[in-house]
């Protein structure tokens, strides 16, 4: 594409007109209807597109200003409980992971507290990455170099709420692992992408234990082999 400026321009223009359509899911507050894991998948590519446009063209064409997109980083931070498990509504698993896109958000917003969960995850002895996750790691090198991780402190806030197609309320009494209480509850509809019939489901954690949990996802193949058309 770098040898054909007309073709490159056409692709970029089409992206600039179509990508905002998919970004409407972040409105109004940033809670992502598809849940924990799919936030990492979709938002990471969204961040890379914005970063590439800013680097190459000097502007992202307003993509980062789409309603709810920048607020979504804080939503994602709250989705990890004090046990180290995720609020796994919709097609999501309990296991938490690092999201390199958070380093871009922290840099863009000038808010290193967004990296608190990343700091915890990246310093764990059992930290590992799948091949799918490894492809995003360069984002940490690029944007993480702008922060002294030793000085990253937890957010001051303890409550996060979001409206929209799948509204959520996420409440905690502390940010250190095993500290205090954590409650996550969701509303919404089963018609959202990757949604379950789980409106009203919640997780509750206290003293480092998850006492109430969402059943989470069922592996797709186990359904497809029984003739369920997903």
Residue ranges and their predicted role:
Residues 33, 38, 211, 219:
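Short, flexible micro-motifs
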Residues 1-37, 140-157:
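Active-site lining segments of carbohydrate-active enzymes
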Residues 41-215:
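Carbohydrate-active enzyme catalytic cores, enriched for enzymes
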Residues 29, 34, 207, 215, ...:
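Short glycine-rich loop/turn motifs that provide flexible caps or phosphate-binding loops at active sites
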Residues 34, 89-91, 222:
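Generic structural "secondary-structure junction" signal
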Residues 212, 218-230:
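C-terminal, non-catalytic macromolecule-binding modules
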């Amino acid at each position: 594409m770098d040898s054909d400026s007309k073709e490159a321009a056409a692709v970029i223009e089409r992206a600039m007109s179509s990508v905002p359509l998919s970004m409407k899911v972040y409105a109004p507050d940033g809670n992502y209807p598809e849940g924990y894991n799919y936030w990492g998948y979709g938002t990471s590519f969204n961040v890379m597109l914005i970063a590439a446009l800013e680097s190459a063209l000097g502007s992202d064409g307003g993509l980062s200003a789409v309603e709810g997109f920048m607020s979504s980083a804080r939503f994602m931070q709250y989705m990890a409980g004090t046990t180290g498990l995720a609020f796994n509504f919709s097609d999501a698993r309990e296991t938490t992971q690092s999201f390199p896109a958070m380093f871009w958000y922290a840099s863009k917003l000038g808010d290193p507290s967004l990296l608190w969960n990343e700091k915890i995850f990246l310093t764990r002895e059992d930290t590992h990455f799948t091949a799918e996750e490894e492809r995003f790691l360069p984002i940490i090198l690029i944007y993480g170099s702008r922060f002294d991780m030793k000085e990253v402190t937890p957010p001051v806030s303890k409550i996060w709420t979001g409206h929209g197609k799948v509204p959520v309320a996420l409440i905690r009494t502390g940010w250190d692992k095993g500290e205090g209480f954590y409650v996550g509850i969701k509303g919404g509809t089963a018609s959202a992408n990757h949604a379950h019939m789980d409106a009203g489901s919640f997780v509750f954690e206290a003293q480092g234990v998850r006492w109430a949990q969402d059943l989470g996802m069922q592996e797709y193949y186990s359904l497809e082999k029984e003739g369920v058309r997903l």
